[in-house]
Amino acid sequence: MLLKKRSPTSILGTLALTGIVISYMIGGGIFSLPQNMAASASAGAVMLAWMLSGIGIFFIANTFKTLSIIRPDLKAGIYTYSREGFGPYVGFTIAWGYWLCQIFGNVGYAVITMDALNYFFPPYFAGGNTIPAILLGSLLIWIFNYIVLRGIRQASFVNIIGVVCTLIPLLLFILITARFFKFSIFKTDFWGTAPQHTLGSIGSQLKSTMLVTLWAFIGIEGAVVISGRAANPSSVGKATILGFSGCLLIYVLLSLLPFGSLFQYQLAKIADPSTAGVLNILVGKWGEVLMNTGLLIAVLTSWLSWTILASEIPYAAAKNGTFPECFAIENSKHAPSFSLFMTSGLMQITMLLVYFSSNAWNTMLEITGVMVLPAYLTSSLFLVKFSLSKKYPKQAAIKARIAMITGLLGSLYSLWLIYAGGLQHLFMVAILLALGIPFYVDSGIRHKQEKTFLNRKEILKMTIMALAALLAIFLFSANKIHL
């Protein structure tokens, strides 16, 4: 009997992958959920918003799980799903956009980390764009670069420790707010329709809270992105569902329990991070310190996860010939060294730019949040396409009809997310994605794949993207749309 030798890069189990999914989703924003949700919605609307978002994002999570089962040969998920389903240019565009999203997102974590640190050392890091903040943020960029260079296994171990340290203060917050929970307070004006309140209809409350909930699940694709590092393909789907379920439960409890100890109008006035403000009211100063410490750990942990994923997509794309082949270079620890250094270098440049304009940076963060959404759409559409093809395995554990329904509902919810992200941000994304066209063309020529990369279909797709970018530039320059 022959034993299949496991690749030295395939070293992540279900626990490590789940840790990456959780840390990728749970960033600093979770510590502001109580106020963010209560600012424009009642307890009833918040509960309904999480229910609807949970159902929608479940189909995206299940899309990734299904694809990991029926197509375990496709590594680095969102990139390879897009390429396999819709050609090399769409695959490149998804990889390019996702990479930019990670770079800007990581620098966003640097800014948030420095701002969180300012609680302990005011005023040196206020706003996250002071000189001390830029220097320390830059140092952390290269520290995380070094950690990941030591190997994905070691980085994921550090990540698991960070996840545990993040969850401890969140669980303490849940226990404390549960201890002070009073149903008489919770049920007061449950739907926010009392005359003295200005929350509006349930529909308007839902709309405002859904905009908060939709960003809470960005990162659910974490296990899929590094599926090439998984010890067992089945672990990818398990980690995705476990991470989704765990985060949803935490989000719901963190958002709803405070409504049982404080009234909606009180929660709406608490400064961010509002979990710290809530505990300061309930148990005193130590609760505030605890949550601010948790915020700092959460952001650093997410930053590490995003560093791992930011280097993985260009690495996978380079191995398939879509990105320049230098991005596929590994070190002796099987870490994507060139991709890491290039990613960290671009993060460093962006970090320096933050010093000159923090307001423009906030807008860029919103745009890059939208940039990941097309990857959800193309992955879901690929599942629909594959489930309808003759290539779908007849003996698959998941029936083709179930896979098709999952992909279809995931596609519809992805379209809703893109719409909710805002038309102005979508146009800006078109400009950023179009910037990758020269690199795609160059890669096709260098790899002598003109017939595949530059055939009529791919040229048509590039033309549509270029025209969308030109339209966006015109609309912005004519002040027809604004960021």
Swiss-Prot record:
Membrane topology: Multi-pass membrane protein
The keyword Transcription belongs to this UniProt entry's keyword annotation: no
Keywords annotated in UniProt: Amino-acid transport, Antiport, Cell inner membrane, Cell membrane, Membrane, Transmembrane, Transmembrane helix, Transport, Virulence
Transmembrane segments: 11-33, 48-70, 90-112, 127-149, 156-178, 209-228, 241-263, 293-315, 335-357, 367-389, 415-435, 458-477
Entry's localization field: Cell inner membrane
GO cellular component: plasma membrane
Disulfide bonds: none
Pfam families: AA_permease_2
Signal sequence, renumbered to the chain: none
A GO term for molecular function: antiporter activity
Gene Ontology terms describing biological process: amino acid transport
Sequence similarity: Belongs to the amino acid-polyamine-organocation (APC) superfamily. Basic amino acid/polyamine antiporter (APA) (TC 2.A.3.2) family.
Described function: Catalyzes the exchange of L-arginine for agmatine. The arginine uptake by the bacterium in the macrophage may be a virulence factor against the host innate immune response.
Name of the protein this chain belongs to: Arginine/agmatine antiporter
Organism: Chlamydia trachomatis serovar L2 (strain ATCC VR-902B / DSM 19102 / 434/Bu)
Lineage of the species this protein comes from: Bacteria, Pseudomonadati, Chlamydiota, Chlamydiia, Chlamydiales
Gene: aaxC
